[in-house]
């Protein structure tokens, strides 16, 4: 169940981004939005203990194995993660719903341009990256989520790539994230070195 909450938005992102030509742009956007809304409802059910989920760490797969370093892709489940799942998925579902209406007749694109599926793919990838960030069991996975949020932010900020202001803002956000990445990596290396 928790795995669906984390990886559902990634599935929606991939389907919306890669299959919109075969299933249609409207179906892709509704599918992506539905996955996030279902995830939000499930996160509330788990949070309110209607369907109890034990505090645990669930290993999904071995991720990185190199010498003494063995990092697994795992989902941490505790009270804080349950709260953050509710926050991330609830806000994301509201953003997806709002975007359905807002993007329906966007005057920034021509009628023959496929833009909605791309936007919803980026938005759903942002949700996935944020969920990885808040449910990470180790620092490498946390960094992966951080990088995913940075990439998705860049893509969403620069979505209207025809506008020079959007391109400029996306580049600024990307550069600022790289500064944060540098500090984050130094912290990870120091923790690894001294532990």
Task: For every predicted segment, state its role.
Residues 1-195:
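...captures the hydrophobic TM-helix bundle architecture rather than a specific catalytic motif
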């Amino acid at each position: 169940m928790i795995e669906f909450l984390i990886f559902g938005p990634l599935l929606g992102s991939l389907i919306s981004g890669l299959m919109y030509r075969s299933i249609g742009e409207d179906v892709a956007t509704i599918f992506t939005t539905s996955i996030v809304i279902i995830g939000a409802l499930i996160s509330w059910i788990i949070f309110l203990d209607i369907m109890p989920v034990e505090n645990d760490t669930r290993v999904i797969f071995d991720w990185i194995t190199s010498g003494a370093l063995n990092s697994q892709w795992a989902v941490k489940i505790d009270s804080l993660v349950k709260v953050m799942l509710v926050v991330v998925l609830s806000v994301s579902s509201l953003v997806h719903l709002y975007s359905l209406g807002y993007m329906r007749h966007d005057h920034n694109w021509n009628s023959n341009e496929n833009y909605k599926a791309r936007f919803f793919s980026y938005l759903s990838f942002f949700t996935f990256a944020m969920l990885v960030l808040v449910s990470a069991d180790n620092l490498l996975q946390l960094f992966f989520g951080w990088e995913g949020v940075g990439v998705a932010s860049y893509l969403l900020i620069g979505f209207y790539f025809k506008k020079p202001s959007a391109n400029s803002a996306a580049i600024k956000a990307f550069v600022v994230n790289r500064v944060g990445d540098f500090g984050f990596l130094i912290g990870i290396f120091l923790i690894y070195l001294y532990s």
